[in-house]
């Protein structure tokens, strides 16, 4: 749920430890309530962080400070408290702002873009269905046993068929979600993306437009099926 360790606190992870040896028992008895409780905690933490990010947009940033924001936090320690997460997210929002500033965008446009992005992420976490949560639970469980095995909910199965059709016959690239980004998994030989030449495996898709002169929609934090629908 939190591969980059930017939402959960160390205390949250400690409280989940009891599930480490009980997960199979819960699934075997068809009792997923404790597992859904983990997701509910995750959703609460995500909303807390997004609300903080939205509030931080109303405050100035000090770009003279010598500090960094690490994108890959998979091996980082969990934040000890809310203050530690606040500092991490202050730098995260500052980095998001700086990226757009370096593109030459004015302050008002930057704040508007980031506000829309964060609000979109909040809407999406609130739209996650029970089917989505159950799929996440089963996939986490099965990946620990057999990494090449996965579970698709009925909705995910239908979306997968749509994605494969649109991605292969449309731009000619297979896409996947990695954290908040849509990433090109591979470019289909002979497809439009390979012929055009600018798209490569591993590229992150941060915006989608329909052609020259059309506005580019910021898709950071979007669900993969919604990105494909554009």
Predicted regions and their residues:
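Cationic-aromatic interfacial patches
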Residues: 1-103
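Soluble non-cytosolic domains of exported or imported proteins
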Residues: 33-36, 40, 105-112, 127-136, ...
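PDZ/PDZ-like domain segments forming the peptide/carboxylate-binding groove
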Residues: 40, 44-51, 62-92, 164-214
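Sparse recognition of residues in long alpha-helices and their boundaries
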Residues: 58, 153-154, 218
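Interdomain regulatory linker/hinge segments that flank or connect interaction modules
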Residues: 109-166, 226-228
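PDZ domains, with a preference for the canonical peptide-binding region formed by the helix
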Residues: 207-230
